[in-house]
Amino acid sequence: MISSDAKVKIQNFGRFLSNMVMPNIGAFIAWGFITALFIPTGWVPNETLASLVGPMITYLLPLLIGYTGGKLAGGERGAVVGAITTMGVIVGTDIPMFMGAMIVGPMGGWAIKAFDKKIDGKVRSGFEMLVNNFSAGIIGMLCAIIAFFLIGPFVKVLSGALAAGVNFLVTAHLLPLTSIFVEPAKILFLNNAINHGIFSPLGIQQASETGQSIFFLIEANPGPGLGILLAYMVFGKGTARQTAGGATIIHFFGGIHEIYFPYILMNPRLILAAIAGGMTGVFTLTVFNAGLVSPASPGSIFAVLLMTNKGSILGVVCSIFAAAAVSFTVAALLMKAQTSTEQDGDKDALVKATSIMQEMKAGSKGQAAPTATQSKKIDMANVQSIIVACDAGMGSSAMGASMLRKKIQEVGLPVTVTNMAINSLPAHVDMVITHQDLTDRARQHAPNAEHISLNNFLDSALYNQLVTQLLAAKRQAANDSQLIKPSILAANDDRYEVQQPSVFQLQKENIHLGLNAKNKEEAIRFAGNKLVELGYVHPEYVDAMFEREKLVSTYLGESIAVPHGTVDAKDRVIKTGIVICQYPQGVAFSEDSGDVAKLVIGIAAKNDEHIQVITTITNALDDPNAIDKLTSTKDVSDVLSILATSQAA
C-alpha cells in the first residue's frame, strides 16, 4: 500500500503540473472550439479561421504553460523568464512543446529566483532596476539557449518514445488496461496529475496531428462515476441512497467528479466497478475511433460534448453511457452480494461504511482510527476563519464551504467560511477542513491551523457537530444567551440556552416601511443615517458599514440583509440598536439574481451584543408566513407584534 509520505509527494507533484494547466484551461477550450468548428472536418469548415489552430497550439498554449510554470516557481519575474525559456524549446523543435513547457517554464522561474536570492541585500542603492531588468534578460536568454539546444531535442525524443508506446497500446488493443491504474489513482486524488500532467500533453500532440484525441476522455469520462452513483440510488441504503441523487446531478451535469469518490472509499470493492466502466469507455472509444479536440474541464457531459467534433459524437456518447452501464451493473452485483449482516439495520450506510473504512485504512498504517480530529488544538471561541480546501479549490471544496457557510450564517456565528486550493492556504487561517487523503498536504501549508479531516465534503452531520461546538464555545466565552435559533437540530441544544434580558427595545421609530432604493448602497446609507438619527452610532459608523459590505455581502437569505459596521468601528457605536427598512420591490445585494433583500436591517451593537440583536430578527425565520408579512405589511404594528413574539421565543 502506498505510504502517506509517498502519496503526499505524488499529490504535490501532480498538483504542480495541474497548476500550470488549470489557470489556462480557458485558452485550451478556446483552441478546442476553433478546432472543432473550423478545421476541414469541423462543424462549419472555414479555411481562414482554421489558420488560428496552428499558431495557437505551437506558440500560445505552450507559452501560457511556461509563463504559469515560471510564476509558480519564481513569482512575476519567474513568469517572464519562464516564457522566454519556453520560446527556446518551442523554436528548437517542430512538434507542440507542452511537455517541454512544463519542464523549462519552472526551470526559468527557479533560475531567476535562485539569482535573486543570491544577490539579496548586495545591490547598491539606485542600481536595483538596472540589475533586475538585465538579470531577467540575461538569465532568460541563457535558459532559452539551453532549452533550444538541449531540452527541446531531449523532449522531442521523449515524446517520440511515449508516442511509440501509445501506438503499441493502441495497435495491441491494450489501451483499455490504463483504467486499471487510472481509476484507483483518481480516488487517491491524483486525477489532476493524471489528466493534466500526462494525458493532456499526449492528447494535445495527438490532436494536432489527427484533429482529436482519445486521451482527453480516459480520465474525464463521467460514465464510471455515473454508474456507481446510480447503483447507490437503486441499491444503496440510508444516507448514501438519499444523497446519491443530488451527487449524480452534480457529477454528470456539473462535472465535479470528486463527488463520487467517497461512495467508493466507503465501499472499496466498488473500485472494480469504476475500473470496469473505465475500460469499457476506453474500448468503446477505440472501436469508434472517437475522441475530443481539447481537454474537457470540468468533466461535465456538456463540456465533453462541446469538445467533440461531429464525426465523434456517436462514439463519445456511446463510450459515456456504455461505461455507466457497465459500472452500474458491476456495482449493483457487488452491492447485492453484501452479506445480510452488513445490510440488516443499516439505516445510515454512508456513516457506518465510512467509519469501517477509516478503521481499515488506519489499521494498515499502524495508527488509531482517524476521526474528525485536529492537528493543533485551539480555543473554539477564537475561531474566526474556516477554509474548506481541496486539490483544485473549485469543485468539492466549494460545495462543502457553501454548506458550512449556510449553517454558520443560520446560527449567526461571526465566522467566515471560504474555499480554496490547498497550495493557496494562508498561514493565518484558524481552521482547515479537507478530505482525509489531503490533510497531510494541508498541514504543510497551514501548520498553525486546526485541521479537520472528513471523507465526504457533503457530510452534513460533521458540519452540524462543528457548528454545535462553535456555538457552545462562543456562548460560554461571551456569556451570550441566544444566538440565532438554529434551523439545524445539531446546533439547537437546550444545554446552551440561557435566558437573559434583551439589550434593546424596538420602537415604531426603528421601523420604516414601503421604501424604494436603486441599489444596495442607497439602502445601506439610508439604514446608516437612521442609526445616526436615533442616536445609536456616530456618523463615521456609516462609512464602516460600506467597508463591511466590501468584505462579504451581508445578505443572509430569505430576503433579509443585515448591513453593519466593521469590527474596528465598534468604538463608534453609542448604544445597541437596529433599524428595520422594508423594500417591497427588493434590493439586489449581489450579482446573484437570487440575493434580493426586502428587509434591510441596519445593526449597531457594542462588543458581541450584535448576536443578540440579530436573534430577535432571525427567530422569525422559522415561520415563512412571518417573513412574508414582514416584507409586505404596511402596518408598523404588525412588525412590532411579530418581532416581539420572536424575541420572547
UniProtKB/Swiss-Prot annotation:
One of its GO terms (molecular function) is kinase activity. Its EC number is 2.7.1.197. It is an enzyme of class 2 (transferase). GO terms for biological process: phosphoenolpyruvate-dependent sugar phosphotransferase system. Keywords: Cell inner membrane, Cell membrane, Kinase, Membrane, Phosphoprotein, Phosphotransferase system, Sugar transport, Transferase, Transmembrane, Transmembrane helix, Transport. An intramolecular phosphotransfer takes places between His-564 and Cys-390. Induction: Induced by mannitol. Repressed by MltR. The modification Phosphocysteine is found at residue 390. It is found in: Cell inner membrane. It catalyses: D-mannitol(out) + N(pros)-phospho-L-histidyl-[protein] = D-mannitol 1-phosphate(in) + L-histidyl-[protein]. The EIIC type-2 domain forms the PTS system translocation channel and contains the specific substrate-binding site. The PTS EIIB type-2 domain is phosphorylated by phospho-EIIA on a cysteinyl residue. Then, it transfers the phosphoryl group to the sugar substrate concomitantly with the sugar uptake processed by the PTS EIIC type-2 domain. This is PTS system mannitol-specific EIICBA component.
